[in-house]
Every structure is written in structure tokens, then in C-alpha cells.
Amino acid sequence: MKKELLKLASKHGTPLFIVDHDVIRKNYRTFKKNLPRIQCYYAVKANSNQEIVKTLFDEGSSFDVASYNEFMQIYRYIRHFEEKAKDFYIWDKIIFSNTIKDMQTLRDIKKYRPLVTYDSEDELKKIAKHCETAGLVLRLKVPDTGSQVEMSSKFGAEPGDGYNLIKKAFDLGLVVEGLSFHVGSQCTNFDNYTTALSIASEIFNHARKKGYNLKIIDIGGGFPVPYDSQVPKFEKLAAVINSEMERLFPSDIEIIAEPGRFMVATSAMLVSKIIGKARRGGKIFYHINDGVYHTFSGVVYDHWIPNFSSFRKGKKEVCAVVGPTCDSFDKISVSEQLPGNLQIEDYLFTENIGAYSIASTTKFNGFDGAKILHLNN
């Protein structure tokens, strides 16, 4: 693998973000195999690269979008469909999972009659005024203890308010199709899922008894990626979810999920180049041509700890790897085990960097983002 990476870096330049679409296909099929009852809605926010979206579209994935622009990314593939097929696709294959939408977005999507989430009475009033054609899914606040990125501090209605928010929606002339939750990104605490499913089932059953025919449960994302050997196996989580769904929910409802990281994290690696070397405070600093304002933005926004590997062998020591910008904040890692004999112009590579990386790249200091190379697309 190293020889091939060196060839690609030499040919295309660095930083080079390499995406293997066969890995994306494998991840999608693994998800479907282990959770056969669940319809997969890829969370576009994880990596919105159009080639990646196209691969998942071709695999049959549905999509979780957060904005009008993300919606239009998917719409471009169905623009040529007959009207009935187009309407069905939007209704069955796209969900606006952002619980807060500005009024213009609601007006823009009204004609498409999409499925949208909400978690407050004020959002209901906006939807009733500007997008009454939408189907609704109530987002619930659930525990996210132990997840890499928590969600519940910003999103989700308190479970105790759940039924009233369903009733309020119907009182406004809207239709609530189901419930959703998110246990936090990169969730390795499987109790979060069992607790969330239990919370959702109580509200679901209460609403049905009151005559509100809910028929969708959206279990969100959070499916863990094997960044290291300590991460529990996805197959183990899938078994837990399958068992709880069978126990708690009737067989006639639709179960959906919003995996993002799970689909793309392991599909990409980055080759970067050492552009400077210095010893500071007794520690070697390797300055590379990518950083936290670019492909390593996940260090900041995603609480992700990257791994670096070198092509040159040597005695390892604790080093710092920092980005190219003039901001001292641009430190990727200050405790990386790397050979101390690496030289300027040597390459480093980082695996499992497909999610929440190029999605939040900036042009800070005038530095461009990594070149993107697609394999097997």
C-alpha cells in the first residue's frame, strides 16, 4: 500500500485525499446486511462530495439532508424522473433532519412535500405557516453519554413534552409521521440506543392509543467506526438494535437511520508532506501542508484524534504535527509517535479520514484544501 500511495502522491501532489468507493459500497452493504429492517438515509453532512453522494445514490441509499443546498444535491439525480416517481422519491428517500429551518428554506421546499423534523412549538408554527405540505417527525432528546460528539444539548424535545408536541402539530392541521432521536456521533455506549428506543416506544404507543397513527421511527446515526481496536463491533450493536426493535415496535412501521461517519470514514486516507521541521521545547515539530483549518478540521469540530504513519523508518519519539497556517491554534497533534529522523519533503499518511474532514475545510490564510482523488468510482 505504501508504494502505491507514494506513486499517487508523486503524480498528483499533496495534500492528497484519496477516496476508495469500493469501501463505501462495502460499508453500505454491511449496514444493510446487519440491519435489514432499517432504511439507510446517508447523512450528507459527513462528506458531501458529489462523487460520494452519487455512489451511495447508485447503491440505493436514501438521504438525510440539513439544508436546501444539500436537498438540491440529491434532487439533481431525480430531476428527470416522472412527476409521480419524483414525488415518491422525495417522500420516501429524503428527510430534512435539521430541526430548525429558516423561513425561506421552508418556503423553498414546500412544493416538494418533504419529510422534516421538528422539536419545538415555535418550529411547528413556522412549518404550519410556510410549509404545511411537509410530513413531520418529532425529534426527541435522549441520552448521549460516552459518544464522541454529543447532540442533546442543542436538539430534541424533552420526552415529557413529546405527546403534547404531537397533538399540537395535528391541531395546527399538520401530520406527524413519526419520531426520531440521535444518541450522539461515534456512539460506543450501546445503552444509549436501548434507552432511546425505550423512550421513543413509550411516546409512540401513547400517541397511537390517542388515535395518532405514527408509522416511522428514525434512530438517527452514531454507528461506531473502528478508529482503534477498543471500538465495539458494529455487528454487536446491530444485534442489540434488531432485538429491541422487534421487542418494542410493531412490524408494520418503517424504521430508518442516518449513518454518515459509518459510510465514509474508512473509505479515505490523506497523504501530506512535511514542509518544515524544528525542535521546540525539546520536542520535534513536523510542519505539514494540511491542518485543522483544512482536512484535519475534524480535530476541532468532531473531537477526532487522527493517526499518522510515515514512509521512512526510524526510532520513534513523541512529536508534534502542526498545520501550515500562521495560527498557533493549528496543531493537529502534540503527542504523535513518529520517527525523529523524518526530513522536509517526506510524506505522512493518515487513514480513516473520510468523515467530517473535507466537509468543513476552509480557505484560511489562502491555503487551498486537499486535492481529491477518487478510486473505483
Predicted segments — roles?
Residues 240, 252-377:
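Charged (often Lys/Glu-rich) extended helix/loop segments that serve as interaction or gating elements
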Residues 135-141:
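ATP-grasp fold ATP-binding core
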